Amino acid sequence: MDNLRETFLSLEDGLGSSDSPGLLSSWDWKDRAGPFELNQASPSQSLSPAPSLESYSSSPCPAVAGLPCEHGGASSGGSEGCSVGGASGLVEVDYNMLAFQPTHLQGGGGPKAQKGTKVRMSVQRRRKASEREKLRMRTLADALHTLRNYLPPVYSQRGQPLTKIQTLKYTIKYIGELTDLLNRGREPRAQSA
């Protein structure tokens, strides 16, 4: 914990230099008084700036997190672009890389792009399914309209169109009556022969 505190204290000293005005103007955590103010007297308070560096990486070196570190320092410890300073093990970090907007962290090839593709695909599937359903309902409506035209006027309701259910019920009833008529017509012929 003491090493972490020393790391943040040295980072704060490094921010006072003139080479990081973009960082201070965009984050403005050093001049702000509040719960995130760095205070050596109170170790229980947070030692990180308001937008925490931990939100970008759990490693103090941005190269380990896959972020560019372009300060041109000597490379050591397997992390390219970062140099370890002295025996204290502190890592030198280029703070200009923090001046970009956090939206750049959501790279184009990340999971968000795949999720967006899935969303677009499901939208396309829904549209196609909706078009198929519309076509099916249109075909069904045309068939019911044709069926209504074949029903005798006895089954219609004085100028009001029949509902789908009424059309089907009356059609079944009408087919039953026609079947009875045909069966009655065949019986006398069978008896006479």
UniProtKB/Swiss-Prot annotation:
It comes from the Eukaryota. The keyword Aminoacyl-tRNA synthetase does not apply. Keywords: Developmental protein, Differentiation, DNA-binding, Nucleus, Transcription, Transcription regulation. This is Mesogenin-1. GO terms for molecular function: chromatin binding; DNA-binding transcription activator activity, RNA polymerase II-specific; DNA-binding transcription factor activity, RNA polymerase II-specific; protein dimerization activity; RNA polymerase II cis-regulatory region sequence-specific DNA binding; sequence-specific double-stranded DNA binding. Residues 34-59 are annotated as: Disordered. Pfam families: HLH (PF00010). The keyword Cell cycle does not apply. GO terms for biological process: cell differentiation; mesoderm formation; regulation of transcription by RNA polymerase II; segment specification; somitogenesis. PANTHER family: IP14615P, MESOGENIN-1. Gene3D superfamilies: Helix-loop-helix DNA-binding domain. Residues 40-59 have a biased composition (Low complexity). Residues 124-178 form the bHLH domain. One of its GO terms (cellular component) is chromatin. InterPro entries: bHLH_dom, HLH_DNA-bd_sf, Mesogenin/MesP. It is found in: Nucleus. It comes from Homo sapiens (Human). The lineage of its organism: Eukaryota, Metazoa, Chordata, Craniata, Vertebrata. Involved in specifying the paraxial, but not dorsal, mesoderm. May regulate the expression of T-box transcription factors required for mesoderm formation and differentiation. Its main location: nucleus.
